Amino acid sequence: MISRRGFGQFCAAALVFGRRLLDAANRAPLSWAIQPGASPGSVRQYRANAQIILLGIPVFHRSDVGDGSASWRESATEDGELVRRLEFTGRSAPERAAGLNRFGFIQELSRSGEAIYFGLMTSSPEESAAEARKALHSTAKDAWYSAIDGRMSADGIETARAHFLAPAKTAPADRQILIERARQELAEAPITKSAAASVPQPFLHALASFLCDPRKKQAQYAYNGRMYWLTVERAREAKSPGVVRVSGSLRRVEGGKPIEFRLWIEESSPHPLPLRIEYQAKSYLRLTFEARA
């Protein structure tokens, strides 16, 4: 027979559970107006280095050709629901990158059963070193940009895309103007919808779950209306105690050539922002982001 105290605890738990169900049914969709609390979170700044590769052999290297940053903020609501925001930004510095002006960033926001993301990048059609050489020392005042806005929830996956021409100014002081222009273009873009068996994570959130849990090896994530496999392998760095190397690959669920990357993290960090990131951006270009001291 249940005790009076036990019955009271059961009723309290049922009340909280019912309240959460009601809140989930009635709450407004997740938006960028909803942000983690006052906690500053974690931020890391990077220096970008570039390496040109021909026939699999590195033939040219240049340091400090750009910069980047990563941030991780999260907090719990009164009901214990976790709100998390992740962001990564990278850009080339034209004065250090032979006039090449490239910029890209992705930001994601999530809570229980729902996630949104917003991305913006300079369009880079070059597929070979010869084509990339023609893009150097450009005097063009405008550049083409691609923007994307995505939402994942129990209702499925929604994606909007935009391609637009705007001033080729990507320095931090000019960035907000460019972001506002991208949001304007996306607001007028058509939305494509697709179904999903469950609510998928966006890319940075899927990666963050791996970095926090060494037991995880593979998961799916959604981007641009498609599903991808993210697979990782971890190994401790013998020469750097407390540092773990994470080797990963991205591949569309329906198949295709994988995209590979490597990053290094502090093993005990609650918000393991990478110390170093290596990424094969093009067949001829390898980028490395190293954390600034």
Where are the predicted features?
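Surface-exposed beta-loop interaction hotspot
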Residues: 160-194
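Acidic, serine/threonine-rich low-complexity disordered tracts
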Residues: 21-156, 193-293
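N-terminal export signals
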Residues: 6-24
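A generic signature of intrinsically disordered, low-complexity regions enriched in glycine/proline
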Residues: 13-17, 153, 178, 217
